[in-house]
Amino acid sequence: MDRDNGPRVRVPEQRTPSIPATADALRFTVLGPVRAWRGSELLSSGSPQQRALLTALLLREGRTATAGELIDAFWGEDPPSQALATIRTYASRLRKILGQDTLVSESGGYAIRTERSALDLTLAQDLAAEAEKARAAGDRCQARTLINKVLGLWDGEALASVPGPYADNQRTRLEEWRLQLTETRLDLDLEVGCHAEAVSELTALTAAHPLRERLRELLMVALYRSGRQAEALAVYADTRRLLAEELGVDPRPELAELQQRILRADEELARPADEPAPAPAPLKPAQLPATVPDFTGRSAFVTELGSRLATAEGSVMAVSAVAGIGGVGKTTLAVHVAHQARRHFPDGQLYVDLQGAGARAAEPETVLGSFLRALGTADSAIPDTLDERAALYRSTLDGRRILILLDNAHDAAQIRPLLPGTPGCAALVTSRVRMVDLAGAHLVDLDVMSPEEALQLFTRIVGAERVGAEREAALDVVAACGFLPLAIRIAASRLAARRTWTVSVLAAKLADERRRLDELQAGDLTVKATFELGYGQLEPAQAHAFRLLGLADGPDISLAAAAALLDLDPHVAEDLLEALVDTSLVESAAPGRYRYHDLVRLYARACAERDEQPPVRRELALSRLLDFYLATAAGVYALERPGERVLDHFTPTEYPGLTFPAREAALDWLFTESSGLLACARQSAAIGMPQRAADLLMAVVDLGESGANSHQFATAAKAVSEAAKAAGVPRAEARARTMLSHVHSVSGRFAEAEAEAMRALDLGRLAQDAVSQGQAPNQRGIIALYENRHDDAEAHLTQALTAFRADGNKPGEAAALCNLSRVHLATGRTATAVRLAEEGVAIYDSDASGLALIGSGRTDPARHVLLEALQIFRESRQQLWHGMTLFRLSELHLTEQEGAQAAAHAEQSLVVLRGIGGDWRRANVLTVLGRALTVIGQTDRAQVCWGEALTVFEELGSPEAEAVRQLLDPAGVG
């Protein structure tokens, strides 16, 4: 079947050369995907909507299309309110591509001014008119040749993937014309005696268009002239039955008359043609390269591709295109699958390396010449032109079952002439480029190996004994190779050839990122050379984007962040990124997100160091990314903490960030971008931007409390503080150390938290930084409160309160008041505790008020306040405070002797705090859980909880240990 619509039309003399191109001439095609060329360069026609506009103008053949006509073409009877503005936008973008003289504005509309021969449709119309003249003059062979050229201009379905009602109508019209031309060509085939060859094509066409009587008439003639009178009559009977059942009509008179002539064995109708001489038995090529003996893994891909090749036995010609980064094992996989599928292709297998990743890809006509010779065609019988060779190639393959492996393809244009024209054969294509424009192809994206597959491949080359002795080092090696098969094979081959090396020696060599690509070479195998082939194919703008994007340390990057780094409009950035994805140099992790393979990132950075000079160009790119992240994160912070003065003290940014309509969307962005944000903070500080890096940490402080990100946050805060210290920027160091103190405190590492807070306060005073002078003593007060140093806690928190008030920081003031409330509660001053807590206005006031109300015996309002806090923390993904509020609720239920509820909340708290909050908090929750369990009579479980809590408190040297020892005393149980 045709890859787009209906059966593939067999045209023995396809396909006609494309429209003649001069160096700068514009050319357009609509008989397939809508495209534009300038000379031999394919131009980007933009979005589907832009292609729809281009289509509407091209099909008017130079006539002006009014705005109203274009709006109708795009949207029909239901245009949007901004339809005219949208049309103008698309027209402006197209004009930039095509030029001011080509896309012109006049009389309130638009037109494309170009030569008639520049459009494939008008060329097809002119050729069809010449064919009619030739036929009328009795030159059937010339008419047939011209019609073949017309049909050869089609490249799949006309106006492929162009949206809009106008395009739909025109697509239907053009497909009808194509079918009429096919009928004309088949009629000419019969007139020149090619009836036997026409039968299979007519059979497929009538199956696809069962009610088209002209096709059935031609099929009856072809069968009759091929000596198949009974089958010809059966076609008529089937036609009569079908028309009666479907439409309630009889066949047209011409068809009935044809049946009578066949019944009479009309000799004039038979018109026997000269029988050609018997052809020699065709050769059976077997060109597949040998499969690698250590082929490993890829079972899902082997099954998927194998099943696709097996379908070639049916009515559809199977084409599968495997794409992936250089070195990922595309050829190895394809050759392995092809060998397994040989039994499905008894007439042979063809293979060619198309050298698509090199500077000079193989020319299709050269490949066709080689294929034709392999299929038994004499040199003297091989035509000169691409179209003639392709036509002969398809004719030679017709009726045979041959597998064609097209390895290392450059693009779909190189592939199309090499594809079979009829079912039975199959093609397997490999390329670094995703063949999205190869209509009908089954696309397979080949990724790197899984860690298990990678280790298996490494083991098969190196040997099980050596790998088994150093399994962890072997895992380090394959991870350093990024699980890329070529890199693993090179590393393993080097190790296998050096018996004195251990696996650990190789792992150590690969640990140095700056040397890693140089280490990954063995003989003529090298990872760097593989990447260089792909890089060399990029356009200058694509190569520039490839280099700069590789500079960012994050595991992936969003489109918006990439646009900031590249200093481009997001639409332009997206086009570049998607082009890089199509070349497999960049991966699309998810819609709108992009990432590099680890080794490709190293290569991109090496290219950037070489080509992005002076170094300030690289620094400016990372500075834009930092500005984007900081500006956006500051907006999230403002939504989370309205009125917070911290943002007023941030370093101004030059590049804007995103804005969010609601808090939920802002938090989604924050947690989605978490790894990139923290990586940017580390990287920016290391290259001389510690102040903005420290500000970024403060803006994303929620990540330090989220559990999944707390370790990354601590690592980033430490890196920023050290970089700020080395650079002599005390304000940045103070803020980074404040954040480091915070995350240490959240994790229960109070000694480290106290040390960082003390240093932060000293630095804040030195730098006269209002932010750290408020937050550092507040942090010290919290630590002292946890350690039951109530006098110190009150002093530090009072100092923080003074600093926050001096700065006009109301949320900070509220936090300090809430924390002071807890100090007063712990020292028995419950009335003051309630008063202080009720003054709190920040998000933490619910938890603090609840704690104070519990201490004063007012449990009902405490329950309400804590449940409100629980909802807030759960929705904002603040896992630490979510877990601690569950802990407070457990304490509340315990005061009411509600043991079951207390135990349930304590157990939930342990689940939420798993991995965050530190051992100290976990031990406190275990202590309360033990108390709750005794209330409901589960004393054995209570003993276990207290035993775990005691171990933690003793390891931390916490004073709570003594209270737990008393609980563990049998006299204290119950």
Swiss-Prot record:
| Regions recorded as binding DNA | 17-114
- Recorded protein name is Regulatory protein AfsR
The UniProt entry's sequence similarity note says: Belongs to the AfsR/DnrI/RedD regulatory family.
UniProt keyword list: Activator, Antibiotic biosynthesis, ATP-binding, DNA-binding, Nucleotide-binding, Phosphoprotein, Pigment, Repeat, TPR repeat, Transcription, Transcription regulation, Two-component regulatory system
Q: Name one GO molecular function term.
A: ATP binding
NB-ARC domain location, by residue? 274-591
Pfam families given in the database record? BTAD, NB-ARC, TPR_12, Trans_reg_C
Native source species: Streptomyces griseus
Output the lineage of the source organism. Answer: Bacteria, Bacillati, Actinomycetota, Actinomycetes, Kitasatosporales
The GO annotation for biological process reads:
antibiotic biosynthetic process; phosphorelay signal transduction system; regulation of DNA-templated transcription
Matching InterPro entries, A to Z?
Answer: AfsR-DnrI-RedD_regulator (IPR051677), BTAD (IPR005158), NB-ARC (IPR002182), OmpR/PhoB-type_DNA-bd (IPR001867), P-loop_NTPase (IPR027417), Sig_transdc_resp-reg_C-effctor (IPR016032), TPR-like_helical_dom_sf (IPR011990), TPR_rpt (IPR019734)
Role summary = Component of the AfsK/AfsR system involved in the response of aerial mycelium formation to glucose.
